[in-house]
Design a protein with these regions (language model features):
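Ser/Thr/Pro/Gly-rich low-complexity linker/stalk segments immediately outside membranes or between
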Residues: 17-27
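Juxtamembrane cytosolic interface motif at the C-terminal end of transmembrane helices
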Residues: 13-18, 93
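Active-site mouth of glycoside hydrolases
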Residues: 31-295, 301-313, 317-320, 331-372, ...
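Hydrophobic membrane-insertion alpha-helices, especially the h-region
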Residues: 2-14
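Short acidic/histidine-rich active-site segments
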Residues: 322-327
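Short helix-terminating capping/connector loops at secondary-structure junctions
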Residues: 133-134, 209-217, 483-486, 507, ...
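Aromatic-rich peripheral "rim/lid" segments of glycoside hydrolase catalytic domains that contact
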Residues: 169-171, 341-439
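Beta-strand-rich ligand-recognition modules
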Residues: 438, 446-459, 468-482, 494-588, ...
């Protein structure tokens, strides 16, 4: 029905100065620290191409670890991301689900059971850090996994007596509502802190250096892709605040990031900013896989550049650096663009946006690994050449300031929107006019008669139109040739929210603001209704400017909007009642111009 146009909007408040905390003023030599929107080492700007590296779990990966890190350094990589966690065993653990289980064997866990630590895994991590040091690489350590590949959150919960968080009926085998208990359960929090302390306070058996004193470490990632369903974000945020403070109490010098997937809506963006604004969080983190993450709408290299700009602007609005911790693309490419073209767009956009680091998934000795880039096969020679080129680009732009457009506080507030516009004077958009006995003009619109719409997701058809997230629908009352006294304009609309799929009843209201010819006429909280009763929102507009336009016979543009700062930004569904039922006398939208 509509021609969809992808539109981008912008971000938040840019702070020109961020006072460094006390622990950053005395960072020892060689440590990476955050300074405003960039990283620095010994006073010099530090930007990087980075890699997730397969060195921890499979026997062949562990054996090839020294070679993998050497090859990473040869490709110009400066930071590698390593998993410093693994819980449970093949025999009694929560195992990975899906087709890549072979990539995540549980032969070398860090912790077999709550009181059964595996020193051999820690010693291997010692060797990883020693080899990284030898190759002038920094290492980012990920301390636990939301997903089941390494045991992770669901294994901790099982140890706490909560078995139903691991459930094959859910995506990736994790019941998110039950897995949220990890953040609040006293036992899981204690077990996590025990693991953190063993990592941070460990003395490397190869180098003799305490991890907390080792400049080889880039920093700590609290969790891989920490999740929280809509409406339960505060539980995750409190956990991140607690654990980041705990790590800083043990190690004041290394960087900390929460380890979140990112955001895909204006609502999620707010929470992403709130988490990354916590005092012990040093930098922001985002992941993206265009083929798999369809809600990111990254369906072209150009869309990827827009995605990166938006996240960079969000990070800069709180004056912190941004790292893309994972980006993946399979060898066969996507949407007509080759793998190497996707990676070139990724690195170029990140470099020119002022991103601190751009990492990829995953450098591996295994040519068969999904999303893997291998140094063992000629297949990836072109990709490895791209890594070298990108590393040079990041080096050349080390001292470049972020683009001014990404520091504009009024832009980039919405990740992405889709829009439609009808042609002027489209007959299909004109309402039915009824003149009442008291000479009141009554205009009736069907939902699908909107002349314009713009939302984060968007659809419509006979008897309905809906938009998710923030945005608007507009309807136009046609101009008249007569003039008439107008005491008020009454607007009625059958409005409901469009809750996120994971809200589970926690997003059953949306804040809708009515504008008439640009004048704010007030907001209503529209709730999810339950049959058989329709709930109609009603505005009695006595504002002078809309009444003046109605008196002069001007066209009246009605905008039903969910604003970017709305307390309940959960879209608009305008429909006949019952929903999906098209009946001639239903009244989803009415406008009365009263004398």
């Amino acid at each position: 029905m509509y021609a969809a146009l992808a539109l981008m909007f912008g971000a938040a408040i840019y702070l020109s100065v961020r006072a460094p905390s006390a622990h950053l003023r005395s960072v020892p030599p060689g440590f990476v620290r955050a300074s405003g929107t960039r990283f620095v080492v010994d006073g010099r700007a530090f930007r990087f191409v980075g890699a997730n590296v397969a060195v921890m779990y499979k026997d062949e990966d562990r054996a090839a670890m020294p070679e993998t890190l050497r090859e990473a350094a040869l490709d110009g990589i400066k930071v590698v991301r390593v998993w410093a966690s693994g819980e449970g065993t093949e025999e009694n653990g929560v195992l990975s689900v899906g087709g890549d289980r072979a990539d995540w064997p549980r032969k070398h866990p860090f912790r077999r059971a709550p009181d059964d630590w595996n020193e051999e895994a820690f010693v291997h991590l010692d060797h990883v850090l020693a080899e990284a040091r030898r190759n002038n690489l920094h290492v980012q350590l990920c301390l636990v996994n939301w997903w089941r590949d390494t045991g992770g959150v669901t294994q901790y919960l099982r140890w706490a007596g909560i078995d139903d968080a691991a459930d094959e009926h859910y995506k990736f085998g994790v019941n998110p509502e039950r897995a949220m208990l990890f953040y609040t359960n006293e036992t899981t929090r204690r077990l996590y802190r025990e693991h953190v302390a063993r990592i941070v306070m460990r003395r490397n058996t190869v180098t003799g250096i305490l991890y907390r004193d080792d400049p080889t470490l880039f920093g700590y990632e609290l969790m891989n892709e920490a999740q929280a369903p809509t409406g339960r974000e505060a539980e995750r945020r409190a956990w991140i605040e607690e654990m980041s403070a705990y790590i800083k109490s043990l190690d004041a010098n290394h960087l900390i990031t929460p380890g979140m997937w990112g955001y895909r809506s204006a609502y999620e963006r707010r929470e992403w900013l709130a988490v990354h604004s916590l005092p012990n969080i040093d930098y922001c983190d985002v992941h993206n896989y265009p083929r798999d993450d369809l809600d990111s709408f990254v369906d072209s290299p150009a869309a990827l550049r827009e995605f990166i700009d938006n996240r960079a602007a969000a990070a800069f609005s709180i004056n912190k650096p941004l790292v893309f911790g994972e980006f993946g693309m399979s060898p066969d490419g996507y949407k007509g663009a080759a793998q190497v073209d996707w990676f070139r767009a990724y690195f170029d956009a990140a470099a020119h946006a002022g991103v601190g680091g751009a990492m990829f998934w995953i450098l591996t000795p295994d040519p068969q690994r999904g999303y893997g880039i291998t140094y063992k096969d000629v297949r990836d020679e072109q990709m490895r050449a791209e890594l070298v080129r990108a590393a040079g680009l990041f080096n050349s732009l080390s001292n470049a300031a972020p683009p001014a457009a990404l520091l504009n506080a009024g832009q980039h507030l919405i990740p992405r929107q889709f829009a439609f516009t009808r042609a002027p004077n489209d007959e299909a958009a004109k309402p039915v006019l009824k003149i009442q006995t008291d000479n009141t003009l009554l205009y009736r619109f069907a939902p699908e008669q909107a002349v314009r719409g713009r939302f984060e997701k968007l659809d419509g058809g006979d008897g309905y139109v809906w938009g998710a997230g923030v945005g608007f629908f507009e309807y136009v009352v046609p101009a008249r040739t007569d003039r008439r006294r107008v005491s008020e304009i009454v607007v009625r609309a059958h409005l409901q929210p469009v809750p996120p799929h994971d809200a589970d009843g926690r997003a059953d209201e949306t804040r809708v603001t009515l504008f008439i010819n640009g004048t704010n006429c007030g907001a209503k909280l529209a709730a999810m209704e339950h049959q058989p009763n329709a709930v109609i929102q009603e505005w009695h507009v006595k504002n002078l400017i809309p009444r003046y336009h109605a008196w002069r016979g001007h066209a009246l543009t009605l905008r039903f909007a969910v604003e970017t700062d709305a307390d309940r930004p959960f879209g608009i569904n305008i429909s006949n009642f019952p929903e999906w039922f098209h009946a001639g006398e239903t009244k989803p939208i009415e406008v009365e111009v009263r004398r």
